[in-house]
């Protein structure tokens, strides 16, 4: 009775219908598979092995539109997070007398020395030094193609930069226009 086909049934093509108990089913017959030579099979095996052990290197400059996994790099440091004072410069390049110069192009600049800074004005102000530059100056802004999707918080407490508008991140879409 196993080979009998009833009138309401049609013969089942096993290449089309494969159920879960036919996991190991391999079709046999001259039209069911393509012949592969041993050289081609070895080449395909090496390609597959390279693909299995290939670890894609993440971009060194992740963007926000790439999604959160772009920021899971194991080699991300505080420099990548934009905290320039976390790693003070290793060696001074200029002469020693340049050390006490004003280090910012901001209209409300602070001297690099703490004593000069206290003599300069309000002690409640944030100290601006070479290790903590003002992030709103043009040289610290990202390039137009790199900075897409980012916004920098103000790094300077001066009145000039407090009037600068900061883009607000819209939760349901892209960055909203600048407003205050």
Curated annotation (Swiss-Prot):
* GO terms (BP aspect): flagellated sperm motility
Q: What is its main location?
A: nucleus
Any one GO CC term of this protein is: nucleus
Q: List the disulfide bonds.
A: none
Is Cell inner membrane among the key words of this record? no
| NADP is among the record's keywords | no
**Do you know which InterPro entries this protein is assigned to?**
SPMIP9 (IPR029361)
Sequence intervals crossing the membrane: none
| Compartments in which it is found | Nucleus; Cytoplasm; Cytoplasm, Cytoskeleton, Flagellum axoneme
Which Pfam families has this protein been placed in?
Answer: TSC21
Q: Which UniProt keywords apply?
A: Cell projection, Cilium, Cytoplasm, Cytoskeleton, Flagellum, Nucleus
Q: Which domain of life is it from?
A: Eukaryota
The record's function comment reads:
Microtubule inner protein (MIP) part of the dynein-decorated doublet microtubules (DMTs) in flagella axoneme.
Subunit architecture: Microtubule inner protein component of sperm flagellar doublet microtubules.
Instruction: Specify the protein name.
Output: Protein SPMIP9
User: Which species does this protein come from?
Assistant: Bos taurus
């Amino acid at each position: 009775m196993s080979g009998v086909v009833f009138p309401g049934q049609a013969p089942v093509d096993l290449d089309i219908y494969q159920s879960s108990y036919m996991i190991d089913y391999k079709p046999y017959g001259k039209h069911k598979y393509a012949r592969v030579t041993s050289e081609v099979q070895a080449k395909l095996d090496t390609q597959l092995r390279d693909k299995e052990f290939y670890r894609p290197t993440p971009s060194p400059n992740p963007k926000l539109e790439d999604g959160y996994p772009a920021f899971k790099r194991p080699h991300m440091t505080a420099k990548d997070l934009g905290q320039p004072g976390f790693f003070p410069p290793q060696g001074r390049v200029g002469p020693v007398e340049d050390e006490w110069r004003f280090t910012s192009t901001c209209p409300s600049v602070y001297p690099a020395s703490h004593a000069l800074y206290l003599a300069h004005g309000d002690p409640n102000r944030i100290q601006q030094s070479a290790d903590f530059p003002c992030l709103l100056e043009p040289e610290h802004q990202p390039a137009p193609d790199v900075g897409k999707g980012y916004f920098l918080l103000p790094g300077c407490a001066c009145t000039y930069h407090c009037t600068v508008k900061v883009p607000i991140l819209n939760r349901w879409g892209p960055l909203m226009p600048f407003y205050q």
